[in-house]
Amino acid sequence: MAMRPARRKSATPPKRPKVVHQFLVALNRTDPLVWRRLQVPETYSFWDLHVAIQDSMGWLDCHLHEFRLLDADEKRLVSIGIPTDDGPEDHPVVAGWDVPLSRHFARPAWHALPTLYAYDFGDDWEHVLVHEGMESAEASLTYPQCLAGAGRCPPEDCGGVQGYADLRRIIADPKHPEHASMMDWAGGPFDPDAFDLSGVVFDDPRKRWKHAFDRK
């Protein structure tokens, strides 16, 4: 699947934001619920938000992603993510690095509408993204920030919602014939409730973009 990123303009190091967007991100159809509350700079693009979601949730950013939301002006659904050569012509995906968050989330009348963030179209992970508003940034903090959360992110490529449920069930049963092999695949004991807020580390979205697309 060929990706077609537009050439991104070189950027100067970002200034400390004066205002931040606050989002609640929750992974659909998982038990226990996996969620994070984030604050990101008002200057962020959808690509930048994607990187913050990946890093806070614990995903490895090794699959395609897509934001699906209602366009406030045109009153239609739009898809924002990584354009590909085989995408639908009647519903193209807009490059996330070209769309600032302010394009869709700066209006009070629309901030409460949920957005869908899809990741890994094979496992089909769907996250509900709720814009909770905008806050004044604290001068002593570096953004993005993860304010709170719960639940451990499922392992990559575990088979989606059903595969994750099977993994938890087998790991929880030492007598299951696949217990040892599943433990080995998961890399050892897996606690679905585990979440260490202090362990969240955010990557630079500009470096992530360069690593993914600009390999010269």
Which role does the model predict for each range below?
Residues M1-K216:
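Short linear regulatory motifs enriched in tryptophan with gly/pro/ser
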